[in-house]
A protein has these predicted regions:
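NAD-dependent ADP-ribosyltransferases
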Residues: 4-242
């Protein structure tokens, strides 16, 4: 199934769950993961809060600032593209694509164009984020993220419900939920992009975390601060298990 067809199907399903038309256009489910995900906490009260439906939303900027290298990632939601060396004209689709990826527009009737070693860095300035894992492994994650844990039994319904409540407070441009892809965030030439920005992290040291991420990008993303979102609608989806 192509990306456009998949997105149309997802939006139809989101509407069936009671999501408004405007909201469903902004929500993207990146994969078909339907099993539980888990959120670990350092403090017991934090776990109890989520089990009641009080959802602590962090921000990308907060995640970038953590000193612990297994928690913090200064390059969170960054992506770097390098053109390599390409020669051609307007009729060469690969050159046109390399130019587009480099931030260069090639109009009709152009020839003898050379693009060499052009680097473009894309950054998602900030967004609200909730990081969970698909792997309940206290022995691996407890020391870094805490020994208290809440199971979110239906991440799809959780994402939809939290998005609806958040939309009532903040105007959301786009939101996505899915597994993090563990790959280099650099690509070149005609290589496939590593994945959706905000959902790609380097394998070392993160791959063992098996992260499942919820991400909400506000239309106005300046000076975002973490906050507690009261969302009793998800209380029945959140169970304290440790």
């Amino acid at each position: 199934m192509g990306r456009k067809s998949r997105l149309k199907r997802e939006r139809r399903e989101l509407k069936l769950h009671g999501v408004s038309d405007n909201s469903s256009r902004a929500l993207v489910l990146l994969d078909e993961h339907s099993q539980s995900v888990y959120r670990f906490f350092q403090e017991e009260w934090q776990a109890d809060a989520l089990a009641r439906g009080d959802v602590w939303l962090s921000t990308l900027e907060t995640c970038r600032a953590y000193e612990n290298p297994e928690q913090g990632d200064a390059e969170e939601a960054h992506e770097t593209y390098n053109s390599g060396h390409a020669v051609g004209g307007s009729g060469d689709p690969e050159l046109v694509e390399v130019a587009r990826r480099s931030g260069i527009h090639i109009g009709p009737g152009c020839s003898n164009i050379t693009i060499s070693n052009n680097t473009r860095k894309s950054v998602l300035p900030d967004a609200y984020v909730l990081c969970t894992t698909t792997d309940f492994s206290p022995e691996k994650l407890g020391e870094t993220f805490g020994r208290y844990c809440v199971e979110i039994t239906n991440p799809r319904q959780f994402f939809i419900a939290v998005s609806e409540v958040l939309e009532g407070i903040v105007s959301i441009r786009e939101a996505a939920a899915g597994k993090v892809i563990y790959k280099d965030r650099f690509y070149t030439g005609m290589e496939q992009p590593p994945g959706p920005i905000g959902f790609v992290k380097p394998p070392d040291p993160y791959t063992n975390q098996k992260e499942f991420r919820f991400l909400w990008i506000p239309k106005e993303a300046n000076e975002l601060n973490p906050f507690l979102l009261k969302c009793p609608e998800v209380g029945h989806l959140c169970e304290r298990i440790a």
